[in-house]
Amino acid sequence: MQLLSQYWGSLNDRKNLQKNFDLDAIFPALLNSLMIAVPVISSTFAAVERFLINCKSESSLGTIIIDEAGQASPHMLVGALFRAQKAVVVGDPKQIEPVQTVQDLFVEKIGGEGIGKYRSKELSVQSLADAQNPFAGIIKNLDGSESWVGCPLVIHRRCKNPMFTVANELSYGGFMINKTMEPKESIEPCKESCWITYDTSNIESTIGKDRYIQLQGQIAFELIQKLRARNVEFKDIFIITPFTSVAYGFKKYMESLSNDIVNWTKEDNKKDWLDDNIGTVHTFQGKEAKVVIYMLGCQSDDSANGAIKWVNANNVNVAFTRAREYIYVIGDAVKWAELNKNLAFAQRYLPIYTLKDF
């Protein structure tokens, strides 16, 4: 135990231990000893390199489990996979994709012939594992193509309709079966799940890549107030958006409103709600709430056409499946239906209103 505390203690303790022992040689014994007391050890891709710095032998670990593998780029796993005897890869390739910071031109030039599919920026640990899995299901995509998904879990237990139907038909080809139970304490919304549009004639273009629309922020706030009047708590409401600038803009707007106008209470914990319940789709993976407000942002003129087209099925799927009971989409219904096939598909299952209809 003394050796364990020295190795995983402070940096000075490890340096002192290194004076008397070859850390590479004793690491397997130290790890085995640790796992007698702690059978399962968790880490992150960012931290596992340092954790295994003295583990340099192939297949020296037992089984590693990679969670949320659909978000991980393959190169992040190479070191841990080299050291493991077995790997269990768990994730959803139809949800959040890896965040890739490498420039497109570099990705195109670095690879040789015959490896085109491995140069995709959307390639994940999950998709590579699925490609090697003989036990799989074929999912038909909205564009008619097919995806090979290893050992798919087909029972869904989170969302009511229309969220389930939109996600199931958009991303899973109708593959899933909905077994979501009725909530023990259901809420009484001010309106059914719907798309909220608005008059776009006075919306001005914003600068650069800022996609926040003040009118959408005002609509979202009014909707929150109407939900609060129906005893829906702040903690049960997520504000999700495809764009960082929209999340930032709405958070600043909410901060600018006086506490009396918003009617915050001590139980609401204003700071935590602003930090945790407003954000981009990427920050809500694995989370859920009774109500989701999906704020699309984007100007109605041509300045945001590229941004509108950028929002893919994975983004829509994650946003919709965060909502257990109700979803409200805020955006220019005409523009999004015209330029984005994924949101156009979602509109089939959502009545379109303006805030005056509430």
Which residues make up each language-model segment?
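Interdomain helical connector at the RecA1-RecA2 junction of SF1/SF2 helicase-like NTPases
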Residues: E113-I203, K209
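Conserved helicase/translocase motor-coupling segment
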Residues: N168-E255
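Signature of the SF2 helicase/ATPase Hel1-core->accessory helical subdomain module
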Residues: Q71-A129
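Helicase C-terminal subdomain and adjacent C-terminal extension
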Residues: Q103-C151, M254, D301-F358
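Short glycine-/polar-rich loops that comprise or flank the Walker A/P-loop
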Residues: S60-L61, R83-K86, S145-G150, C190-S193, ...
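Conserved Walker B
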Residues: V38, F45, I66-A72, P93-K94
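Conserved helicase C-terminal RecA-like lobe
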Residues: A229, E233-F238, S245-T321, A333-E338, ...
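Conserved helicase NTPase catalytic core signature
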Residues: M1-G62
